[in-house]
Amino acid sequence: MLVWLAEYLVRYETAFNAISYITVRAILALLTALFISLWIGPKVIKRLQILKFGQEVRNDGPESHFAKKGTPTMGGVMILFSIGVSTLLWANLANSYIWVCLFVLFGYGAIGFVDDFRKITRKNTDGLIARWKYFWMSVVALVAILWLYWLGHDTDATRLVIPFFKDIMPQLGLFYIVLSYFVIVGTGNAVNLTDGLDGLAIMPTALVAGAFALIAWATGNVNFAEYLHIPYIKYSSEVVVFCTAIVGASLGFLWFNTYPAQVFMGDVGSLALGGALGVVAILVRQEFLLVIMGGVFVVEALSVILQVGSYKLRKQRIFRMAPIHHHFELKGWPEPRVIIRFWIISLMLVLMGLVTLKLR
């Protein structure tokens, strides 16, 4: 929005021309989202306490989690608000990719909000009925995918980038829709499953979003795209602003969510952030890179799938409890140790993912 204002004001003061640079707006978006999150955080937490929007805890979970019961949840609303305001202020709103990203963010956020609200009003951990939850997640995902498919300016927009192989980029055609569906829905659920400990999901989210900011910038720059042998997606560099807004909002939320947490993001935050990462990965054609950099999310989701599958087939559990972070808790790891080690792993995976861009 401020891009348009700067275009007018530059006639009178050339310093406003700085706002036309994507790097400047990306930094400002990060700082804006961070400051908004820090500013409204105490107010949101107090309001959630007044409304008695407290966390419900599973009876079969680790005993250390019983003390978390009643901690304000649905704090993801402050994340969404911070990202939304920051993006609307600093992004070029004439860019359709920005609206696709915001659509998924708030679409999944709305689904998560309803899910959280049902848990709170029913005083248990059962939210939306699974089939309805997946139905609405699928609707949002498919609308966004078809929107992106329609926006595709050239064949590169539907190519599949395979790490380590610069000359292998198959054209997906309509399979692009199928792959993209699983990426968005899968990432939304994976981040949701990861959000079980204080700060566990939000830091990897910030790291992955920061990495995708760099990738989106390179993808939208014809020279860097050619240098890295990745598809050049026209206008995709504007998504950098959205990604850095996620980073800023995530860091601001972490201020209140770090152990011991003052607030939880709830499904309204985790589903929204997961969906946002998924749609950005599709937009910049780096689905495989999302699997690498978001490895913590992938492992958390796989642990649940393996646990459920093993119990149904063999009546035996692989882990003491799934998602896998609970397994380590039941083995005696203190919660902060699990969190910090997962953060370290996430940082290493993000760096590995970025390195693969050059090792091709």
Swiss-Prot record:
GO MF annotation list: metal ion binding; phospho-N-acetylmuramoyl-pentapeptide-transferase activity; UDP-N-acetylmuramoyl-L-alanyl-D-glutamyl-meso-2,6-diaminopimelyl-D-alanyl-D-alanine:undecaprenyl-phosphate transferase activity
Species of origin: Haemophilus influenzae (strain 86-028NP)
Subcellular location: Cell inner membrane
Claim: Disulfide bond is one of the keywords in the record: no
An annotated GO cellular component: plasma membrane
Pathway participation: Cell wall biogenesis; peptidoglycan biosynthesis
Name used for this protein in its record: Phospho-N-acetylmuramoyl-pentapeptide-transferase
Biological classification of the source: Bacteria, Pseudomonadati, Pseudomonadota, Gammaproteobacteria, Pasteurellales
Function (record text): Catalyzes the initial step of the lipid cycle reactions in the biosynthesis of the cell wall peptidoglycan: transfers peptidoglycan precursor phospho-MurNAc-pentapeptide from UDP-MurNAc-pentapeptide onto the lipid carrier undecaprenyl phosphate, yielding undecaprenyl-pyrophosphoryl-MurNAc-pentapeptide, known as lipid I.
Gene name as annotated: mraY
